[in-house]
Swiss-Prot record:
This is Probable aquaporin TIP1-1. Aquaporins contain two tandem repeats each containing three membrane-spanning domains and a pore-forming loop with the signature motif Asn-Pro-Ala (NPA). The chain crosses the membrane at residues 25-44, 58-77, 103-121, 144-163, 170-192, 216-233. The lineage of its organism: Eukaryota, Viridiplantae, Streptophyta, Embryophyta, Tracheophyta. PROSITE patterns: MIP.
Length: 250
């Protein structure tokens, strides 16, 4: 059971060179992802005169985020696991695959990466505002359910393709599968709540623009969805090896 595998770890872990390198990898991967994802939306809006919220803008956002996440996960996979998302890190924690202290280190790196990406975008685009997440035609509770379900699908995909020790050669396509599910979910939820699935992705633009409306939805929803996916996959589908009982010949 994952609850028995959950580990707090030691505070000294945050100073370990391996943990610091992993955190740096998360910072860089998240910066790459947010810069490309947010930047594509800003560029599309500039070229179309505010058309980022049109059907074409939604498709462009889905494709850009899918490609960017594919790259971000790939470049970080061998160093940190390529989480690029506090909800993925939380799902790994509740499944017993990362310690609390290392997970918190990842969170800090991911939030910093998103924030720096948004500041860089604002500076390099002549002061254009980064796109913040908001609700359109749905209540906060409906948006919360959307974020839970979409993030569940994302973290479940992460477990199936990257975490499961039985994944075999499937692990080679993990970044592609993870990018695809995010792109597909953006097509589903983008028109309603922006389809964050990632607290870091919504935190950076909110901080830079200082716009916190419904921000809690983009934390609570992904963390619930990611946590549920981690526990369910770990409990139901990851087999734990047991020592065979000795046999006696009569």
């Amino acid at each position: 059971m994952p609850i028995r595998n959950i580990a707090v770890g030691s505070h000294q872990e945050v100073y370990h060179p391996g943990a610091l390198k992993a955190a740096l990898a998360e910072f860089i991967s998240t910066l790459i992802f947010v810069f490309a994802g947010q930047g594509s939306g800003m560029a599309f809006s500039k070229l179309t005169g505010g058309g980022a919220t049109t059907p074409a803008g939604l498709i462009a956002a889905a494709v850009a985020h899918a490609f960017a996440l594919f790259v971000a996960v790939s470049v970080g996979a061998n160093i940190s696991g390529g989480h690029v998302n506090p909800a993925v890190t939380f799902g790994a924690f509740v499944g017993g695959n990362i310690t609390l202290f290392r997970g918190l280190l990842y969170w800090i790196a991911q939030l910093l990466g998103s924030t720096v990406a948004c500041f860089l975008l604002r500076f390099s685009t002549g002061g254009l505002a980064t796109g913040t997440f908001g609700l359109t035609g749905v209540s906060v509770w409906e948006a919360l359910v959307l974020e839970i379900v979409m993030t569940f699908g994302l973290v479940y995909t992460v477990y199936a393709t990257a975490v499961d020790p039985k994944k075999g050669s499937l692990g080679t396509i993990a970044p592609i599968a993870i990018g695809f599910i995010v792109g597909a979910n953006i097509l589903v939820g983008g028109a309603f709540d922006g389809a964050s699935m990632n607290p870091a992705v919504s935190f950076g633009p909110a901080l830079v623009s200082w716009s916190w409306e419904s921000q809690w939805v983009y934390w609570v929803g992904p963390l619930i969805g990611g946590g549920l996916a981690g526990v369910i996959y770990e409990v139901l589908f990851i087999s734990h090896t047991h020592e065979q009982l000795p046999t006696t010949d009569y």
